[in-house]
Amino acid sequence: MQAFVNRLWYPKGFLDTQSKGLFLLLKIIQLLLLPLSLLFAAITALRRSLFKIGIKKQSRLPVPVIVVGNITVGGSGKTPTVIYLVELLRRHGYQPGVISRGYGVNFEGVRSVLPSMAARDVGDEPAMIVGRTGVPMVIGRNRIDAGEHLLTHFNVDVIISDDGLQHYALGRDIELLILDGDRRFGNGSLLPAGPLREGLWRVKKVDAVVVNGGQSIEGEHAMSLVPSALKPVTHSNEQPPALNDAVVAIAGIGNPQRFFTSLINAGFNLNGVKAFEDHQAYCEEELTELCGDLPIIMTEKDAVKCRDFAKQNWWYLPVDAKLSSNFDRLILDKLKR
């Protein structure tokens, strides 16, 4: 199902492989869904307008808030961007904290994220962010409550709201829109005919557009994800696989093909690949059956969910976001205002 949706939403990535019949079918489906997309567009625009004119209340926290988000469904590089911001702010004397929804975790109220907590209790992305940086972090459906809890229990002077672009109840000082440079805005339609959560007009309202890979255009900030050495998912005495060794690659992220392509470009010998749903909950039996005795290479986001049952020949590939000094100055200058 997800593969079919990707062909509908991101047709440019499949032009070389799909038949004329399939292309026509996708166009018909898109046209049939357009009335629902128009309704969705009206609802989202009305909702934002209600906050803008004050009918719906927007609450501000007593510290600057940086919102990191996107207007497309699926992965774009928000988590590496959040980690980059945490490290940037710390280098310049700030004490950042992070708030997030905690996707896939059902609980009431808010919850502090600690490095010792399992991904199933806080969400894979919060577990990854805190595991990498140790930053104070609170998750909760209500971002205002999460922010207030963060300020009450931790020494924080700037808050990063992960995936918070559409959470208009929380006031913000800086808005960052993260965009997959290969997929960009897909077919340009709103849900369900396309991948957009909001119209393209939203791009002009943010403080900066960060483009992850692909081609950026004038006014956008190019970001690259730089891989480092393989790391074991759990404690291991084994050596990581060499480039000519056969491995199996898995990814449960918004754009798994980007990860597989990065491994191929790095020279790894992929004996098999398996793309899972974003935020996939893994089990030992499934992955063991998939790879047999071969090493597995996965993303860091996947690794935080596999540590309790990982084999010694399971590895993950850390990546670090790289942005320009112009982007750094933009963030720091806006915080000083």
UniProtKB/Swiss-Prot annotation:
Example of a GO biological process term = lipid A biosynthetic process
Q: Which top EC class applies here?
A: transferase
Q: Which residues form a coiled coil?
A: none
Which amino acids does the record list as binding ATP? 72-79
Q: Which residues cross the membrane?
A: none
What are the alphabetically sorted keywords of the record?
ATP-binding, Kinase, Lipid A biosynthesis, Lipid biosynthesis, Lipid metabolism, Nucleotide-binding, Transferase
Q: What's the EC number here?
A: 2.7.1.130
Any one GO CC term of this protein is: plasma membrane
Per the record, the pathway is: Glycolipid biosynthesis; lipid IV(A) biosynthesis; lipid IV(A) from (3R)-3-hydroxytetradecanoyl-[acyl-carrier-protein] and UDP-N-acetyl-alpha-D-glucosamine: step 6/6
Reactions mediated catalytically: a lipid A disaccharide + ATP = a lipid IVA + ADP + H(+)
Source superkingdom: Bacteria
Query: What Pfam families does this protein map onto?
Result: LpxK (PF02606)
- GO terms assigned for molecular function: ATP binding; tetraacyldisaccharide 4'-kinase activity
Query: Which InterPro entries did the record assign?
Result: LpxK (IPR003758), P-loop_NTPase (IPR027417)
> What task does this protein carry out?
Transfers the gamma-phosphate of ATP to the 4'-position of a tetraacyldisaccharide 1-phosphate intermediate (termed DS-1-P) to form tetraacyldisaccharide 1,4'-bis-phosphate (lipid IVA).
Q: Which NCBIfam families match?
A: lpxK (TIGR00682)
Recorded family membership: Belongs to the LpxK family.
- Protein name (record): Tetraacyldisaccharide 4'-kinase
Q: What organism, scientifically named, is this protein from?
A: Shewanella sediminis (strain HAW-EB3)
Source gene? lpxK
